[in-house]
Swiss-Prot record:
Gene Ontology annotations of biological process type: aspartyl-tRNA aminoacylation
Family classification: Belongs to the class-II aminoacyl-tRNA synthetase family. Type 1 subfamily.
Keywords (A to Z) from UniProt: Aminoacyl-tRNA synthetase, ATP-binding, Cytoplasm, Ligase, Nucleotide-binding, Protein biosynthesis
Binding site for ATP: R229, D230, E231, Q238, E497, G549, I550, D551, R552
Protein name: Aspartate--tRNA ligase
Subcellular location as annotated: Cytoplasm
Organism from which the protein derives: Leptospira interrogans serogroup Icterohaemorrhagiae serovar copenhageni (strain Fiocruz L1-130)
GO molecular function: aspartate-tRNA ligase activity; ATP binding; nucleic acid binding
Protein's UniProt keywords contain Cytoplasm: yes
Function: Catalyzes the attachment of L-aspartate to tRNA(Asp) in a two-step reaction: L-aspartate is first activated by ATP to form Asp-AMP and then transferred to the acceptor end of tRNA(Asp).
Ranges for region Aspartate: 207-210
Principal subcellular localization: cytoplasm
InterPro entries to which the protein is assigned, alphabetical: Aa-tRNA-synt_II, aa-tRNA-synth_II, aa-tRNA-synth_II/BPL/LPL, Asp-tRNA-ligase_1, Asp-tRNA-ligase_1_N, Asp/Asn-tRNA-synth_IIb, AspRS_core, GAD-like_sf
EC number of this enzyme: 6.1.1.12
Length: 601
């Protein structure tokens, strides 16, 4: 390798940082040839490094025999360049490039490595299938989109650490090899070679350990942590993902919300230049479910669910009147301009809601020139139709969709329909951000399939002050489990839950009662959570916290379609890494060491 190359590794210039003030200076650059153009006697090479692109000009009359080396350059060759920075002629200025007013006139060139022709274009404006990008992730990093997202991710996490350090938080690493407590999603299990027939589990969250840290007196903890869940994947899920995990001692819910608002406001401004207004609005869980059909409502548009049960309870349309009579509800969502929705589309919506949300049907009315129109309007009095229209604020050209069933089915089905129709009729403004706290969650939810109570958040969530009397005895608690609310809170951005947490239970007595409600007996509780229950007997302080989904936040802030867009080496929706081809079989010897025998599938 030429001597001048090694001498300048430390003193290199960065392509994206060059500017006109350096005109006449000798510049040394390292990078990849992005584009090249041979114009007979002059070769133009767009040299790319992490910071940007600079045009390098090789002139035959200046280079002599060395010009033949420039002629060998092809796409993605690794180059070392030395030359003089010059301003471009006016007719050569490229306003689309950050360095479009300057160029480097080549003095010396070295090809450090050659490259095969890439399987896809590395130009940011060219469409490339996600499968190809995941298989050749190392090439995708050279594209502006992924590279910039990785840099933003670094800046985002750096800003978090910087802010929390100033707020007296201590970053502490919790174990990756954990005890399996399969209460939520499935655990990823790791067999122990030293302890045959025993298994570790990769952590779904550091929940118990961070509570232990509070018992230990650390008071303010945070961690940028990897979490693992073996679940079916969707657009916003990965088997491994990154959280900002936090826990506080001697703190109220109000103080936690305020602290988080300060953090979010600061990092959004520093990293993305987004100015937020704090405190963030708050909405109760009950309001979110009743008016939006979701505990993570997208509030950038209207189309609220409106309860019209009182209006239709005595109407002649038995689907509506019968639902109210049987203790259910009737709600309507008004779609502005939705009268253009075709009958075929309505049939498709009906089938979808029946399949995924158990909705028995989807009644509808159009708001025409004479008011509400439909095949069912003849079953309603004029006053009832007028009252429905007034309740939801419909006007000519709108479409009204109705749900009539159990309250839960109506809320979930119309909430899902609201989101689907918003993509067409209520598209939010570009770059609009709405962040809202959802508070006052139920502590438990009834599991119809297993006929039991489940924790809505997790078993360690503290009851609200209003619900504490329910915990005076197990008999009282069992009777009022459905009425108990929790000191729990979720932070929702544009219809996506980006964070959630709660005040924790610091009383062993209350914690044991919660376990009993959930059907976890004393022996099972001791086996799974014994070390936490024991720790609670050694002076556990009042404490609480939350976790942020860093991947989800960055997906929203960088305009990604999936969290795969902001993760360096993500898995597919089948949990596969197309680049490294994992998961993969292992050698029989490894299985024997672990005392594992594979079953035929």
């Amino acid at each position: 390798m030429k001597h001048w190359i090694q001498e300048n590794y430390k003193n290199r210039s960065w392509a994206g940082e060059l500017n006109e003030s350096q005109e006449g200076k000798q510049i040394v650059l390292f990078g990849w040839s992005f584009r090249f153009r041979d114009q007979g006697g002059v070769i133009f090479i767009d040299l790319r490094d992490r910071t940007g692109i600079i045009q390098v000009v090789a002139r035959k009359e200046l280079l002599g025999d060395s010009f033949t080396l420039a002629e060998k350059v092809r796409s993605e060759y690794v180059l070392a360049v030395r030359g003089t920075l010059k301003k471009r002629d006016l007719e050569s200025i490229n306003p689309r490039m950050q360095t479009g007013t300057i160029e480097v006139v080549l003095d010396q060139l070295e090809i450090l490595n050659v490259a095969k022709t890439p399987p896809f274009s590395l130009d940011e404006f060219d469409e490339v299938s996600e499968e190809l990008k995941l298989k050749y992730r190392y090439l995708d990093f050279r594209r502006e989109e992924l590279k910039n997202r990785m840099i933003k991710r670094h800046e985002f996490i750096f800003a978090i650490r910087n802010y929390l350090n100033k707020r007296k938080f201590v970053e502490i690493e919790t174990p990756i090899l954990n005890k399996s407590t399969p209460e939520g999603a499935r655990d990823f299990l790791v067999p122990s070679r030293l302890n045959p027939n025993q298994f570790y589990a990769l952590p779904q969250s550091p929940q118990i350990f961070k509570q232990i840290l509070m018992v230990g007196g650390m008071e303010r903890y945070f961690q940028i942590v990897k979490c693992f869940r073996d679940e079916d994947l969707r657009a916003d899920r990965q088997p491994e993902f990154t959280q900002l995990d936090m826990e506080f001692s001697f703190v109220s819910q109000e103080e936690i919300l305020s602290e988080i608002e300060g953090l979010v406001e600061t990092i959004y401004k520093e990293v993305f230049n987004i100015q937020l207004s704090i405190p963030f609005p708050r909405m109760t869980y009950n309001t979110a479910m009743e008016e939006y059909g979701s505990d993570k409502p997208d509030l950038r548009f209207g189309m609220k669910l409106v309860d019209v049960s009182e209006i239709v309870k005595d109407c002649d349309f038995n689907v509506f009147a019968g639902a109210v009579k049987n203790g259910g509800t009737v709600k309507v969502v008004c779609v502005p301009g939705g009268s253009i929705i075709s009958r075929k589309e309505i049939e498709d919506y009906t089938a979808w809601l029946n399949r995924d949300y158990k909705a028995k049907g989807l009644a509808y009315m159009k708001h025409g020139t004479e008011g509400l129109e439909s095949t069912i309007t003849k079953r309603f009095k004029k006053e009832e139709l007028e009252a429905i229209s007034k309740a939801c604020g419909s006007k000519e050209g709108d479409m009204l969709f109705f749900g009539a069933d159990e309250r839960e089915i109506v809320n979930h089905s119309l909430g899902a329909l609201r989101l689907k129709l918003s993509e067409r009729f209520e598209t939010p403004k570009e770059n609009e951000i709405n962040i809202t706290w959802i508070v006052d969650f139920p502590m438990f939810e009834w599991n119809k399939d297993h006929k039991r109570w489940d924790a809505l958040h997790h078993p360690f969530t503290s009851p609200s002050d209003e619900s504490i009397p329910f915990f005076e005895s197990m008999e009282t608690l069992q009777k009022n489990a459905g009425n108990a609310t929790a000191k729990a809170y979720d932070l929702v951005m544009n219809g996506v839950e980006i964070g959630g947490g709660s005040i924790r239970i610091h009383s062993k007595e209350i914690q044991n009662k919660v376990f009993q409600v959930l059907g976890i007996n004393e022996e099972e509780a001791k086996e799974k959570f014994g070390f936490l229950l024991e720790a609670l007997e050694f002076g556990a302080p009042p404490h609480g916290g939350l976790a942020f989904g860093i991947d989800r936040m960055l997906m929203l802030l960088t305009g990604g379609k999936s969290i795969r867009d902001v993760i360096a080496f993500p898995k597919t929706q089948k949990g596969l890494c197309l680049m490294s081809e994992c998961p993969s079989p292992v050698e029989e010897k490894q299985l024997q060491e672990l005392k594992i025998k594979l079953a035929k599938v």
